[in-house]
């Protein structure tokens, strides 16, 4: 009987112990979570205070810089008289571009928004006009390189509020805010509201900073490609339409009258550079001037779009020879072959031919094409694409051990091709060299060809104004994908031909807004790996402490499970000790005499 009450009493005590333990653990958990949250808030406040201090320092520096602007502008006016002969690097503002065609599918730069500033990564897009990015409070935005822009952190931000129909520039009033809405040809759409703030461009080569106020779009909804891109926003570089929101590039040159209204883009396989105020002659390939003269002489002797002087195929040692020559390049603007921009607000130019092995495969007399750094690939009409693809397919050999297939290609004659080539022998030589060097080719999605090497692949030649033929090398119209080089051409969409990034690559594309013209100069563009990009306080850190991202209910359950596990172990241990004390083994009740008998 006594044992029974003892057992009951112990289990009651044990139950109380379990209850108190669970209550204690749960409260400790909540307290710890609150402490973590408070620490995060304190860190955020400290960062905000540091940002404000930085902003005050920047304002002081701006005042000092503004005092020197008058003196510098006077010097600029004197220097501008000699700028027609030479572009001085000190007068240029250079900005590093990051990204590539394969992994990112775009190139982007970093600019500062607000006072104190918050860094935002923006895709460089000459095919659009808006400057926009996600803002704090957006529930339909993706995870990008930086956290959404926080308007409350900036002392200079101002939302563009409205009352039914008083929005400027013909904008719509939605929810007492002027609506921002942008649609793109690939199907992406973003919308939100407009706000104004200070835009600052920190140049890596020039201590002076370009800064001005700009009306920008705050994303409250993203979809399609924008939802999954790594860069935070978009920076449009096209021109202002009548009665439209003033664009970035127009405001930039309006607030820096000392600069020439010229900018250039130079991208390599990884990264590149944006140059404001001119272009960089030092990047020109050393034999560029010789090439232009040679091409002009070739064009003067051409007939009906076919070049009479033999255009060589891309050779393995071309780049080595170009770099080894020590030829002085003239910096005179007159040596650059300019192309007129054919439309008012976007960068369209006319092309008059596209040559492959000396044969013009374009069936139209001319074609308007958009020069667009926001498009990854170059989009051409379907008939031109099919012609190029036909010849590249012949040069694409999947299995070097398939003797039947190889012999079949080697037996091709010029008459058996869809369109005879002017330099058919060069085509056959390239095919033989590809086979001999085992330049294997594979096909990826949508039949896109990829070669292991650029060797013996053909150059393309684009005919521009004044019958000037510009070389388009495989290192440009193909892009690096792991250990292969893949075709960067696609069929046009919505009847809109585009010269995309695969045309920009390894060229300095110069936009002269004063003369309304564009030039393409083969250049050795700088490389900037994304891994070398400076870090910032407002970046999105993917490797944060995982426990800070777990919800409180999940964290509570985790602690509860741990507590129950510990308590269960204690119960089993106490139970074992209890039975050992109150229920001794039968052998323990026997006397020593009984055991001996």
UniProtKB/Swiss-Prot annotation:
Residues 573-597 are cytoplasmic. The chain crosses the membrane at residues 552-572. Its EC number is 3.4.23.-. It is a single-pass type I membrane protein. Residues 1-551 are lumenal. It is not clear if the zymogen has a cleavable propeptide. In vitro, appears to be cleaved between Asn-87 and Ala-88. Cleavage of the putative propeptide is dispensable for catalytic activity. Keywords: Aspartyl protease, Coiled coil, Disulfide bond, Endoplasmic reticulum, Hydrolase, Membrane, Protease, Signal, Transmembrane, Transmembrane helix. GO terms for cellular component: endoplasmic reticulum membrane. It holds the Pfam family TAXi_N. Residues 299-311 have a biased composition (Low complexity). Residues 58-75, 289-298 have a biased composition (Basic and acidic residues). Residues 107-521 form the Peptidase A1 domain. Disulfide bonds join 135-218, 138-141, 162-173, 167-178, 266-525, 396-441, 450-486. Residues 33-88 form a coiled coil. Residues 58-83, 289-323 are annotated as: Disordered. GO terms for molecular function: aspartic-type endopeptidase activity. The active site is at 125, 372. PANTHER family: ASPARTYL PROTEASES, PEPTIDASE A1 DOMAIN-CONTAINING PROTEIN. Component of a complex composed of SPC25 and PMV; the interaction is mediated via the transmembrane domains. The complex interacts with the SEC61 channel-forming translocon complex and is involved in the recognition and import of PEXEL motif-containing proteins into the ER for subsequent export. This is Plasmepsin V. It comes from Plasmodium falciparum (isolate HB3). The gene is PMV.
